[in-house]
From Swiss-Prot:
Membrane topology: Multi-pass membrane protein
Keyword set, alphabetical order: Membrane, Transmembrane, Transmembrane helix
Location in the cell: Membrane
Organism listed in the record: Escherichia phage Mu (Bacteriophage Mu)
Induction section of the entry: Expressed in the intermediate phase of the viral replicative cycle.
The organism's taxonomic lineage, starting at the top: Viruses, Duplodnaviria, Heunggongvirae, Uroviricota, Caudoviricetes
Protein name: Uncharacterized protein gp19
Any single GO CC term annotated in Swiss-Prot or TrEMBL for this entry: membrane
Main subcellular localisation: membrane
Transmembrane segments: 9-29, 32-52, 68-88, 94-114
Length: 120
């Protein structure tokens, strides 16, 4: 996988995740809407980590800020996974498969970043 396509995956994932959040909020009510707000925060943490990583790679931000990339990614992905687990217990009538798909995408995002960091 080229470096350019590896950089485009996080952008694609954020669009997919935000579309899923919109779908959940439209069809599941207020609890789902609160879950979506928390999920947007989770996705924002992952996007912030990607932006910081891109700024470091382009030498616009000093290298010593690289220590914040992984904590932001882990915090965003794990909080999204935790939100998905909590939401499935709260949203009894909601589409649980969509919520678990969100958790799966956040976990995939984390593993993709790990793989790109090791072999990139």
């Amino acid at each position: 996988m080229s470096e350019r396509s590896a950089r485009q995956w996080p952008d694609f994932l954020s669009v997919v995740l935000l579309a899923l959040l919109l779908w959940i909020s439209l069809f599941c009510g207020w609890r789902a809407l609160m879950f979506c707000c928390a999920s947007v925060f989770s996705v924002a943490l992952c996007v912030a980590a990607d932006c910081l990583d891109a700024l470091i790679m382009s030498c616009r931000v000093p290298e010593h800020f690289a220590r914040f990339v992984w904590p932001l990614t882990w915090l965003g992905s794990l909080s999204g996974l935790g939100l998905a687990v909590m939401a499935t217990s709260q949203l009894k009538t909601g589409p649980e498969h969509v919520i678990w798909a969100l958790a799966g995408l956040l976990t995939f995002w984390l593993s993709f970043r790990f793989r790109a960091r090791l072999f990139g």
